[in-house]
C-alpha cells in the first residue's frame, strides 16, 4: 500500500505483515482516526497483473499465466504467503490483522457505516475456473472498536 505525495514521490505505507509479503491490497477505506482498512486478496498474484503466483501457489494451482484461462508462465517463482484477510494500517504504517480468512472466506469489498461504528465486508463467491471453494457471497457486519 503506497501514498503518492504532493511532490510526486511515493511513500510505502505497508508491504508486509509479520515478515510476509502482502498479496495485493485492494478495497481500501479511510477511517477518521487516520487509519486505512483494506482487503488483501490474491488478485495481483497473477502474471497479467504484474506479480505472478508460481505454479502450485494458492492463487495458481494449475501454473497458468492467467489461472482461469491462460497458458503456463515462463517467469516467476514467488508463491503467495498470506491468506485473504482484512488489515488496518495505523498512521505510522503498523498493520493489524482485523479479519482473517477463517472468519470470512475471500473477503473482498468493505465499507464503514456513516458513523464509523460498523465495518461491512463482502465474501466473494467462487468465480469461473476457480479451483478453491470461494466465499459465500454474504455481507458480514462487524463492530469497530479502536484498532479492531
Predicted regions and their residues:
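Sequence-structural signature of mature extracellular/luminal beta-sheet repeat domains
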Residues: 1-148
